[in-house]
Amino acid sequence: MSKDFLLEIGLEEMPAKYVTSSVLQLEKRVTDWLKDNQIEFKEIKTYSTPRRLTVLVEEMAEEQANRVEEAKGPAKKIALDDEGNWSKAALGFAKSQKVAPEDLTFREIKGVEYIYIKKEVIGEKTTALLPSLEKVVTSMTFPVSMHWGSNDLRYIRPIKWLIAMFGEEIIPFEITGVSTSNTSRGHRFLGKTATINQPSDYPNALLEQFVVVNASERKQAIVEQLRELETMENWQIREDDDLLEEVTNLVEYPTVLAGNFEKEYLELPEEVLITTMKEHQRYFPVFSQEGELLPHFVTVRNGNHENLDTVARGNEKVLRARLSDADFFYQEDLKITIDEAVAKLQNIVFHEKLGTLTEKMKRVQKVALMLADYLNWQEEDKQDIIRLTNIYKFDLVTNIVGEFPELQGLMGEKYALLQGEKPAIATAIREHYLPSSAEGDLPQTDLGSLIAIADKLETLIGFFCVNIAPTGSADPFGLRRSAFGAVRIIQANGWDIPMLEVVSRIVDMERAEGATELPSSDVIKEVQTFLKNRLRVILQGHHIRHDIIDAVIGGDPNMIPQLIDRAQILNKHADAEWFRPTIEALTRVVNISKKYEDGVEVDPSLFENEYEQALFDKLEKLKFDFAGLKIVDRLKAFADLRTTIDAYFDNTLVMTDNDELKNNRLALLFELASFIKEFAQMDEINVK
């Protein structure tokens, strides 16, 4: 037999961005509780609004199933005395398990006999267990929390009401003075209390009180109303998943409405208008069918269609004030030159241990010019780098960016173009912030890519130099994002930048600038490990086998595009018939070469058989060809070596008693192993 179960936590309005994650957390905690208590159920449904977190468990069993439990006791030699009677240890075990001594049996595990018991456990009634769900509710955690009144509990918002029902029965418990009942609350202004007679009545009972408890249904209602408005007005209202998710969790009964603003505000940069509407007011911007921004907006009301005109006028008034402020800020920004703005950066501290923004920009300039040298850029390009790195943070002191931090870079590009900077420099000002997320867009220009890499590497290494690195989930300065972004940009451009050398040179530069809390060798090692870990994430995203990832990162991690190519090519050919014997042969070379002693060079005159000469000849050809080969051809070259390597080992005793011959053979294998290890640590690859 089964019944439905309903748990609703009624709250004061939660921040919209935490509603979905909170109800999913509640679902998981209830699911875990059910599994831990071995209570069967069909399905769990979740419902959420800004004022409630709810789970409805369908067909929850009315009692736990009876079950047989086993328990292991002491070893037989301890359980029996010399006369074969039960020892105190055995009798104590039986008592602790609430069974009679005659119920004890023996079972052999790995050659040793132990006492075992089997006992039937009668399942408890679900109603006897459900009150412990109080601990599930109070154990929830949130990014932001508060306590209220004299209560010790910290929660996302004060708990105002609770429902816990198993069928028609109310499950009694109390949290912060609020007792469970079968009564919920409707819309704050349109609804009344809602009595829930059965858990399955919950959605409809709340709908009668102007609450759509299903977040997906609220979202769909908003989308449908937006589409209707588009058709009616011949507008475009572009899809914005983040904004749609937020407004869905801001309202309980959504009604879409439109408003207008003065056309003169269209003279503001489009990004300023859109950001004002979206970020400050949670409005949807409106476009023509040709993609032109129009002097209208769409918002979502938490209510019905009554007095929509009045609501629209109120929203227009608020937006008008916002746009007036934005227009003032923009006009003020146009009065200052870029160089005047740059001068103010010397008064802004980047970090107390790393100096001002001006000092950071100077360091980034050195890094960017260093990278340009590695990439063989021309002098004209370097002059662009110098101008760019002298100004690229200037928009941080503008009024618009002060009001809308998310427009940094975008406004820099616009102001730079207005003041006559080269388009390439203006674009790079915007692009140096990219990517803005793990999967975000990358810079599309060479100059933007270079400055983005330089800025991110300088930030990363600078913080490591002053002993500030991510710990666990804490990364307040976004260093993982910086490293990941730099690696992605390098990969996308296919730039063979010697990262180990670059890291070392940047560390030396940072120390020369005064960032000296850790020895250079420690910083270099930590940064290299950190970058390798970011590479692991990228390779995992390419669905590369973990053993192959270990192999290529253990090889030469210097040139990032080549490393990623090596991983992809090894992964692609891992199922080929020749792959396993090739890896085994190469691994054998590497393992034996570890016995090589420094200083010994290969002397062909000491070869005793044709197989040594054949391997030497192949190695000499490999030396000549290797640098010019594509990555896939390097792997093919190793595969072609396999028969020569096998023949060599079949006919040559490397560890001979003759030290001169032994060392000469080890020297030959060591030279070959150096090429193999540069490609990958082949012994990390699983070919079993």
UniProtKB/Swiss-Prot annotation:
GO biological process terms, semicolon-separated: arginyl-tRNA aminoacylation; glycyl-tRNA aminoacylation
Pfam families: DALR_1, tRNA_synt_2f
GO terms for cellular component: cytosol
Alphabetic keyword roster: Aminoacyl-tRNA synthetase, ATP-binding, Cytoplasm, Ligase, Nucleotide-binding, Protein biosynthesis
Molecular function GO labels: arginine-tRNA ligase activity; ATP binding; glycine-tRNA ligase activity
Enzyme Commission identifier(s): 6.1.1.14
Catalytic reaction annotation: tRNA(Gly) + glycine + ATP = glycyl-tRNA(Gly) + AMP + diphosphate
Keyword Aminoacyl-tRNA synthetase: yes
UniProt-annotated location(s): Cytoplasm
Main location: cytoplasm
Complexes and interactors: Tetramer of two alpha and two beta subunits.
Family: Belongs to the class-II aminoacyl-tRNA synthetase family.
Protein name per its UniProtKB record: Glycine--tRNA ligase beta subunit
Source organism (scientific name): Listeria monocytogenes serotype 4b (strain CLIP80459)
